[in-house]
Amino acid sequence: MPRKATINGIAKLEETAFELSEVVILRYGTLYGPGTWNTENGVIANQVRNNEIVATDGISSFIHVEDAARAAVLALNWPSGIVNIVDDYPATSKEWLPIYATAIGAPNPKIQTGKNSWERGASNNKARKEYGWIPLHPSWSEGFKNFMSV
């Protein structure tokens, strides 16, 4: 139920935003980097260390906070519409969670088949091809390794 309320709220927010004459809606992937839940001492890291997150077939798309901020600035000059702001590699949690766990020095996660119906990645093709946006951190796997070693 809480997820449905969140999704309904976002849908209403987007619907309301489109009442404006010009609006660009940026749909960000899961943020990582400084100041996010995914930092080495963040909420997600603690859950991974405590083995509270299970690796599944569910797909996620990530975006480094630096790329998210750059997209927001560039979007000031983009035409109205909805644009996904994600890196180049959507991944199952079976792919990203072990790499993340290693980056923070946590044990390997438990693995389970299946996924939630809402777990799916996104594409940045529109941002790249129509607006020339290119992520500075195109790969979550390199991004995880780099920002955790800072």
What are these model-derived regions, one by one?
Residues P34-V43, K94:
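Short beta-loop-alpha junction of Rossmann-like oxidoreductase domains
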